[in-house]
């Protein structure tokens, strides 16, 4: 059997799990399809006995389909629009990202969490949830159970944010503009930002959704420097790319991140030339579906019992990051006169 044919059973299995997960994600956007995919994968893994037939395809999906999803994610970024609208929120975005990464780094040894899980929780909390985890996991060579743990933590606090933040914003007296920035900087995943802003709009008959989404997309750009920094750090630590001249940036930089940037530049250029943004909608949708497929593969490679036993510390780290980001986002708004 050829290499491609050996991958087919595992690919089909991930596809079959992704389809109901995608449907459930549409029904319950506050949870999201990636979480359903991981759950379905982990549940099936408890009973699944034909791993030899599907192993190669599952591994291919969790690595290469995931990287392809990140590349396609770039087609959802019009850099001109993001920079024009997101510049006001840039100081807040930088502050919240720096806070989450520093908190994750500082708490990792104290909580006795493995470095990869702490890194994934940090980038997932600070940048863009599942998409940031998807982009970072291959760079740091995270294991599937570490990815599943981080995604589960991010999901938990996404759900809490969507439920609590509209009432918190009202209690604090945030303006519509202030809440859009708050939701865009303090909520992790795009679907949860959408749910949070929509709940606020329903309460106040306003339109914060567009502003919150663009702030969120501006955060997504942080994937580039963060993944580059992590890849260089890992290369230096492992001494696997050292030459007489020093580091080779070409070898250190993950190629799929370069293609992500290229996709963003193509989108920006085409839209500036008058091409409708709707042209790229199908690629954005395909990116999301590929992430769901990859999460199904990660679920299939994850031990659910072990995840439950070892997940408490990761949840605590996620809570610390979440509270820190929330406080910094509000404090920065106050200092900048937005709130």
From Swiss-Prot:
Family annotation (InterPro entries): UPF0324_pro
This protein's record includes keyword Hydrolase: no
Protein's name in the database: UPF0324 membrane protein M6_Spy0799
Top-level taxon of the source organism: Bacteria
UniProt keyword annotation of Membrane present: yes
GO cellular component, one term: plasma membrane
Compartments reported by the entry: Cell membrane
Membrane spanning stretches: 7-24, 28-50, 57-79, 84-106, 118-140, 150-172, 256-275, 290-307, 314-336
UniProt similarity note: Belongs to the UPF0324 family.
Membrane topology qualifier: Multi-pass membrane protein
UniProtKB keywords: Cell membrane, Membrane, Transmembrane, Transmembrane helix
């Amino acid at each position: 059997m050829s290499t491609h044919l050996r991958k087919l059973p595992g690919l089909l299995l991930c596809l079959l799990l992704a389809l109901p997960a995608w449907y459930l994600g549409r029904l319950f956007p506050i949870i999201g399809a990636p979480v359903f995919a991981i759950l379905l994968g982990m549940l099936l893994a408890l009973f699944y006995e034909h791993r030899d037939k599907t192993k190669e395809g599952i591994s291919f999906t969790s690595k290469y389909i995931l990287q392809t999803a990140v590349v396609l994610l770039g087609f959802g970024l019009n850099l001109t629009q993001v920079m024009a609208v997101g510049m006001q929120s840039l100081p807040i975005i930088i502050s919240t990202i720096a806070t989450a990464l520093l908190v994750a780094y500082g708490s990792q040894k104290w909580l006795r969490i493995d470095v990869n899980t702490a890194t994934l929780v940090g980038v997932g909390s600070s940048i863009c949830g599942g998409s940031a985890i998807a982009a970072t996991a291959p760079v740091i060579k995270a294991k599937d159970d570490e990815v599943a743990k981080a995604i589960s933590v991010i999901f938990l606090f996404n759900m809490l944010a969507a439920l609590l933040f509209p009432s918190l914003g009202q209690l604090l007296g945030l303006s519509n503009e202030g809440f859009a920035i708050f939701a865009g900087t303090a909520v992790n995943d795009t679907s949860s930002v959408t749910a949070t802003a929509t709940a606020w709009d329903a309460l106040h008959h306003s339109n914060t959704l567009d502003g919150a989404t663009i702030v969120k997309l501006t955060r997504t750009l942080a994937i580039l420097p963060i993944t580059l920094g992590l890849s260089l750090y890992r290369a230096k630590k492992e001494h696997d790319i050292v030459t007489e001249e020093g580091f080779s940036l070409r070898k250190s930089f993950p190629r799929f991140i370069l293609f992500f940037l290229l996709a963003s530049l193509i989108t920006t250029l085409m839209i500036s030339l008058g091409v409708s943004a709707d042209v790229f909608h199908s690629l954005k949708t395909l990116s999301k579906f590929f992430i769901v497929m990859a999460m199904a593969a990660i679920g299939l490679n994850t031990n659910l019992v072990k995840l439950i036993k070892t997940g408490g510390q990761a949840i605590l780290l996620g809570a610390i990051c979440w509270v820190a980001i929330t406080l910094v986002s509000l404090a920065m708004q106050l200092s900048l006169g937005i709130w």
